[in-house]
Amino acid sequence: GSSNLVDGNCADMVANYPELANLSNIQCENCHGPASQHPGQAGAEDVKMATSLDASVCGECHHENVQWERSFHSQEDDRAFTYPAGPGRESCVKCHAGGGYIDFANGVPQDEYRVEVQAHTCAVCHDPHDATNPHQLRVYDEVVLPGSDTPVTGLGSSATCMVCHNGRRAPEDGGLPHYTLGGAALLGINGETYGVELGNTAHTALPTRVDCHM
């Protein structure tokens, strides 16, 4: 607003917050393309701005993506993305397709999840338009573990990972159970009871998932 138009503000930003100065004047067209494309959609039933989950859109300004590029999250042709996607795979794409994860995080009913093959790019985990959570993460601090429906809080950024990095119990009517992954093992919950008490992993008192892997 006009209250921010104070002499010296711009010079102070450039001097003390150079990374912010580099992102000044970022507007809709930087991510969504030229507005001249929109008149061509006049009369369409569902007129929307062009959107893309391609990492190159974010990479125009954010260059810290080497770690992501070297992970399987970026490999769209990997079997983890190609096999579980497609029609009839609505229960899989929450984790195995970028669009499905976004729909899950936005509270879309499961039978309406997007099922197209899509790697987990930047905008899958980070919401470009919502800064409610730190790092603009779509899922933060709390997650419900699959199988037992156990709610876990206080996870911080690691909740983003634990949505998918957990096992699924074997259903009685068949299906594809998943072996347990880091989330439940790290927390020492969501397992079977055998009448013997075992100490929790020491990692429960140490930094969580993203502190080591990001």
Explain the meaning of each model-derived region.
Residues 1-214:
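Short sequence/structural segments immediately N-terminal
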